[in-house]
Swiss-Prot record:
Chain spans, region Oligomerization domain: 466-610
Pfam assignment, any one: CPSase_L_D3
This protein's domain notes: The large subunit is composed of 2 ATP-grasp domains that are involved in binding the 2 ATP molecules needed for carbamoyl phosphate synthesis. The N-terminal ATP-grasp domain (referred to as the carboxyphosphate synthetic component) catalyzes the ATP-dependent phosphorylation of hydrogencarbonate to carboxyphosphate and the subsequent nucleophilic attack by ammonia to form a carbamate intermediate.
Keyword Disulfide bond carried by entry: no
Binding site for Mg(2+) 4: E902, N904
Record's protein name: Carbamoyl phosphate synthase arginine-specific large chain
Residues in MGS-like domain copies: 999-1154
Residues engaged in binding Mg(2+) 2: E362, N364
Residues involved in Mn(2+) 1 binding: Q348, E362
Required co-factors: Mg(2+); Mn(2+)
Gene name in the database record: argA
Gene3D superfamilies: 3.40.50.20, ATP-grasp fold, A domain, ATP-grasp fold, B domain, Carbamoyl-phosphate synthetase, large subunit oligomerisation domain, Methylglyoxal synthase-like domain
Subunit structure: Heterodimer composed of 2 chains; the small (or glutamine) chain promotes the hydrolysis of glutamine to ammonia, which is used by the large (or ammonia) chain to synthesize carbamoyl phosphate.
Length: 1176
């Protein structure tokens, strides 16, 4: 725990320790015009304004200028730049930070404009910002919005690396100065210094802060030369990039390939001396324009340096630091003051475990992933406070929004320990490298709170995956030494195996892993209790041992597995002993001052409750972000919680994801930062005496325990869990569809391999393997022959051994349609029909969705509505549901075939998309249906004509997953989504495509690499479109070469694609100026020696756009044809506005159907009004 803290204020004199959670004394009033500390040099007073008067070792390009005023009374309109689609390295934490920033602006009566194409986020809901632009977060498009809206200020530090890079570009373009837009908070020059590694090291040298020996380079040869000078081992780090794009090359050839890859994605890389094995420590710092500075939180990585902090287990506060804590704290304050941060930032250190020697790794002068973790770990509203500081407020005048009883100038103090564990989904990808290093690979993270490290860690392990009971030996590698020495996504379980089964000592494990012995001794405590439980018969368990186990973080299921009993039997015994958890409050002050927060957790290391209980309605959140469940389910959970509160009912949110808005302090009457498993939900339900539980807005995780909750006597609100179970079980679901006359593909229950083969031969290949109770298509596969059938059927049954596996006919070349809907007691209230661009066979989460649908006629829309009505009635649905339907186009006068392939009796990932596109909040309607209160009348949104189109495009993170095959199939692979509006499908797709992080359009006369299945009818059409646009076509496949060259007026050249030599492959792509890869392969590569695989992988490795679906390739080329001028995209120019540049209100406007509280700007203050026709 932290023993003492202080508030640093230059005005108050030298830094001195004070009692924790107390403000500094002697803080004097700021000067008439307050200023931030300079990036370099000292400020002096001239005519009441602070100016730079000492130029000592200025970084190149720095221009002395007056310091900005601490207050901005003229700022009445501010543009907030969002982060775009979720990707590895830049995820949902920016929805949280951006949402808090917008709330802070609203409180200050400032009109807020938001640009963010991530339609799944809370911040893009229209009760927050007054205008929202679903446009690319690029300098050009932000400039278009600035031209149109003419704001007074811009906030760049709440949209991650994307927003920061855009701000720097806008400054260089001169747009901000020309339009008179003030950068609020941290100035651009400070952002540049923090991002340019060379300038940052220069700044650190000026104040005698040590940094790792490094050289900034922008070419491959310079990287090789720098490495020779510094000497291996080295680390290669990218500047201006998110999520630590870097790695540890061991020799010249590895460095050459890594530098080429990094320089294709970032303009500069840093070659540093490797400090692998040192401790890694972070400090979150807040500073205002009057130079008041506090440390919000310090965190320590469980894993030593060498693993990206986003992929590390992290604890807060630090546990193994002594005097080093104050040394690094003072250095962080010194750095932040020197470079001139105004707002929030984090400083990362490498600390020698055997001395007080340290190095600064980096500084993020913006809200970051660590900021979100620190904010949730301490209860301190970092993003809210940073936004207020950006408007000129000081820490000492800002109230703490959480405690209501202190100011923001109080440093948080913790009487608990927080553990963060990353969530990797590497097992979903074929050929992926599972090692974990300096390049981030995790897709999400969990945060657990306990009173001991053991309790906190075991909680966090269960939060990562419900299949994990705790610190157990889930991985038993054959080569233990390699598994422990080289970090990977399963090393924690290898350590458990080493300690539980192989009796490795703490000293030996420390030598292998370099993990601090303090942490290893804590793991040894868990192992000791584990062994005691394993050796004690259930009948001999006493209260003392059960209490010890619970205090050490063991779950009921874990104890049951060790004693040979069921979870229910352990729960019954535990309650008989009176061993139940206590509810504790996070007050940010370690209980030193009265503070009545609603931010709660449970612990067995306590003796009293901190709260009284009041029968609220529980809403189960989505848990950790992972592929298949991301920010869209947080939007659903938050929206539902707000709707229930609007009905006058108290809400209880349960979630453990620090990146979410649902875990914000003001989104529910009570927030439990807790597990979403059966045991903990039941504990909270019993303690609170809750009036009911909502399980249908948090994705698959809450659904999986719905039936158990009902059987335990819980009042599950909305659709009956028995019906949920029937829809989740493919066999039961198909039987119900048969009974109501809704068509579906032919199917059978695969009870044996022989019966599966017989079915496949009867209906014909391809067939689809579908296990029950899975999310994002885990283990689903299209099977094209008998050999694949054997392999995939085995894989599927391993995923869900307790549920039957369904094998169904796969309809090739069919269209897929999503139907999102809400019903009440079996009656359909509202529905939306979205059309996939890709044919069936691509997971709906990876598909490109179009709304309103572009090729479904009114007759088929009516038939789809009828199917939705039948399904709602059959399952007696009360709440949200989603269906995926196959549409086989007719061959003659008959109707198109419509076959239901899946139905989820919960909100889907497309609910935010359809709600915002149609202007009707589906979750508000669903919440009314769930609560059976104020249920609206049915409405047919699809019968209304609209003069706009919206397209949702997936965001992939292939670059972060070395070796993974970038192929689209029935198993989901995307990490996020973006969406844009347009007057037609081409405008919308153009904007959505450019919204994808890292998307670079091909230039005129460049090369396109074409490959894949020549039987695809789209291949010839795509080739014709590209040649008409002036592109040169290349292929590596002789079949493609022959096929294209046989067509009139088309030509393609065959080139070599080396499948083993990355260096040679890169040179060939550069030689032929390949700027896009289009691959139409029918199936995933069997090996890494496949040329299609090599081409796809090369595209993502070297930052080349990849189009890997035939239908998508047609839309891509048609869009280029519509949007290119002289075979090139139109660059930004003053006074020009592309047709897709419009706000949500510009496009949706009066098409919105739900009356909802909106925000209007009167010129003096925000007014909360009812806007006719405005929803979402």
């Amino acid at each position: 725990m932290l023993r003492s803290i202080s508030i640093a204020s230059r005005a108050a004199g030298p830094v001195r320790p004070v009692a924790r959670a107390r403000t500094a004394v002697g803080v004097v009033a700021p000067p008439r015009v307050c200023c931030c500390a300079p990036a370099v040099g000292n400020y002096g007073q001239v005519d009441g304004k602070a100016t730079l008067n000492s130029l000592r070792r200025l970084p190149a390009g720095y221009r002395p200028r007056s310091c900005p005023s601490s207050r901005s009374p003229d700022v009445k309109k501010v543009l907030v730049v969002g982060s775009g689609g979720l990707s590895i390295g830049q995820a949902g934490e920016f929805d949280y930070s951006g949402s808090q920033a917008i709330k802070a602006l609203r409180e200050s009566n400032i009109e807020t404009i938001l640009i963010n194409p991530n339609i799944a986020t809370i911040q893009t809901s229209h009760h927050l910002a007054s205008e929202i632009y679903f446009l690319p977060v690029t300098a050009d498009y932000v400039a278009y919005v600035l031209e149109k809206e003419r704001p007074d200020g811009i906030l760049l530090t709440f949209g991650g690396q994307s927003a920061l890079n855009v701000g720097i570009q806008l400054e260089k373009m001169g747009v901000l100065e020309r339009l008179g837009v003030q950068v609020l908070g941290t100035p651009i020059r400070t952002l540049e210094i923090s991002e340019d590694r060379d300038l940052f090291v220069q700044a650190l040298n000026e104040i005698d802060i040590p940094a790792a020996q490094s050289t900034a380079v922008s070419t491959i040869q310079d990287a090789l030369d720098a490495a020779k000078t510094i000497g291996y081992p080295i680390i290669l780090r990218s500047a201006f990039s998110l999520g630590g794009l870097g790695s540890f090359p061991h020799d010249e050839e590895e460095l050459r390939n890594l530098a080429a890859k990094s320089l294709s994605l970032s303009p500069q890389v840093l070659i540093e001396k490797s400090l692998k094995g040192w401790k890694e420590v972070e400090y979150e710092v807040v500073r205002d324009a009057a130079d008041n500075t506090i440390i919000c939180c310090n965190m320590e990585n469980f894993d030593p340096l060498g693993t990206h902090t986003g992929d590390s287990i992290v604890v807060a506060p630090s546990q193994t630091l002594t005097d080093e804590y104050h040394m690094l704290r003072s250095a962080a304050i010194k750095i932040v003051r020197h470079v001139g941060v105004v707002g929030e930032c984090n400083v990362q250190y490498a600390l020698d475990p055997n001395s007080r020697d340290y190095r600064v790794i980096e500084m993020n002068a913006r809200l970051s992933r660590s900021s979100a973790l620190a904010s949730k770990a301490t209860g301190y509203p970092l993003a809210y406070t940073a936004a207020k500081i950006a408007l000129g407020h000081t820490l000492r005048e800002l109230p703490n929004a959480v405690t209501k009883s202190t100011t923001a100038c109080f440093e948080p103090s913790l009487d608990y320990i927080v553990t963060k564990i990353p969530k990797w989904d590497l097992a979903k990808f074929q050929h992926v490298e599972r090692n974990v290093g300096s390049a981030m690979k995790s897709v999400g993270e969990v945060m657990a709170i306990g009173r001991t490290f053991e309790e906190s860690l075991q909680k966090a392990i269960r939060q990562v995956d419900p299949n994990f009971a705790g610190f157990e030996a889930y991985w038993k590698p054959e080569d233990m030494i390699t598994a422990l020495t080289n970090n990977n996504d399963r090393r924690l379980f290898a350590i458990a195996h080493a300690m539980l089964n192989l009796d490795y000592s703490v000293d030996y494990l420390h030598d292998l892993t370099k993990i601090d012995k303090w942490f290893l001794y804590k793991l040894e405590n868990i192992v000791a209790v584990h062994k005691q439980l394993r050796s004690t018969p259930f009948e001999q368990l006493d209260k003392e041992l059960v209490m010890t186990a619970k205090k050490t973080g063991f779950s009921d299921l874990q104890i049951a597995q060790l004693t040979g009993k069921t979870e229910a039997e352990v729960r019954t015994l535990r309650k008989q002993f009176g061993v139940t958890p206590f509810v504790k409050r996070i007050d940010t002050l370690a209980a030193e001052f009265p503070a009545y927060t609603n931010y709660l957790y449970t612990s067995y290391n306590a003796t009293t409750h901190d709260v009284k209980f009041d029968n609220g309605t529980m809403v189960l959140g989505s848990g950790v972000y992972r592929i298949g469940s991301s920010v869209e389910f947080d939007w659903c959970a938050v929206t539902c919680s707000r709707a229930i509160r609007d009905l006058g009912k108290k809400t209880i949110m349960i979630n453990y994801n620090p990146e979410t808005v649902s875990t914000d302090f003001d989104e529910a009457d009570r927030l439990y930062f807790e597990e979403l498993g059966f045991e903990r939900v039941m504990d909270i339900y019993d303690l609170e005496g809750a009036s009911g539980v909502v399980v249908s807005v948090g994705g698959q995780l809450p659904q999986n325990i719905a039936l158990r909750l009902k059987k335990a006597g819980v009042q599950v609100l909305g659709t009956d869990p028995e019906m949920i179970d029937s829809a989740e079980d493919r066999h039961k679901f198909s039987s119900i569809l048969d009974s109501i006359g809704v068509d579906q593909p032919a199917w059978t229950e695969a009870s044996s391999l022989a019966s599966a083969k017989e079915f496949a031969n009867r209906v014909g290949y391809p067939v689809l393997i579908r296990p029950s109770y899975v999310l994002s298509g885990a283990a689903m596969n299209v099977v094209w022959d008998e050999a694949q059938l054997e392999h995939n059927l085995t894989l599927a049954t391993n995923v869900s051994p307790d549920h039957p596996v369904v094998i169904s006919q796969f309809i090739d070349n069919a269209q897929e349609i999503d139907v999102d809907a809400v019903a009440h007691k079996g009656k359909l209230l509202v529905h939306a029909v979205s059309e996939h661009v890709e044919n069936a066979g691509v997971h709906s989460g990876d598909a490109t969705l179009v709304l309103p649908p572009f090729s479904v006629n009114q007759h088929d829309l009516g038939r789809l509505k009828t199917i939705a009505e039948k399904v709602a009635q059959a399952f007696q649905i009360s709440g949200p549901f989603n269906m995926q339907i196959i549409r086989k186009p007719p061959t003659g006068e008959e109707d198109a075939e419509l076959k239901v392939i899946e139905c989820n009796l919960r909100a889907s990932r497309s609910f935010p998309f359809v709600s915002k596109v149609l202007g009707h909040n589906f979750i508000d309607t669903a919440s009314a249906a769930i609560m059976d209160t104020n249920v609206p009348a049915p409405i047919d949104l699809m019968a209304q004509k609209r003069d706009y189109v919206a397209i949702k495009v997936p965001q992939f993170s292939w670059t972060r997953l070395p070796g993974a095959d970038p192929f689209l199939g029935v198993e989901m692979a995307s990490t996020g989504e973006v969406a844009s509006f347009g007057k037609d499908i081409y405008d919308a797709y153009w904007a959505a495509l450019l919204s994808v992080n890292g998307m670079k359009l091909p230039k005129a006369n460049s090369g396109i690499l074409l490959g894949g299945d020549i039987t695809r009818p789209e291949m010839t059409e795509v080739a014709k479109n590209l040649i008409n646009l002036g592109f040169s076509l290349y292929t590596y496949d002789p079949k493609v070469e022959a096929h294209i060259n046989d067509q009139p007026y088309l030509s393609i050249k065959k080139i070599l694609v080396p499948v083993k030599d990355k260096k040679k492959l890169r040179e060939i792509l550069e030689e032929h100026e390949i700027q896009t890869v289009i691959n139409m392969a029918r199936s995933r590569a069997a090996t890494t020696l496949d040329e299609d695989y090599a081409a796809r992988r090369a595209a993502v490795d070297f930052g080349i756009p990849l189009i890997n679906n035939p239908k998508l390739a047609v839309l891509f080329t048609e869009t280029l044809e519509k949007k290119f001028v002289k075979n090139n995209p139109i660059p930004y120019s003053e006074g020009f506005k592309p047709s897709e540049v419009g706000s949500w209100r510009d496009f949706v406007g009066e098409a919105a159907t739900t009356k909802l509280e909106g925000i209007a700007w009167t010129g003096e203050a925000y007014c909360i009004i009812l806007i006719p026709g405005i929803g979402v």
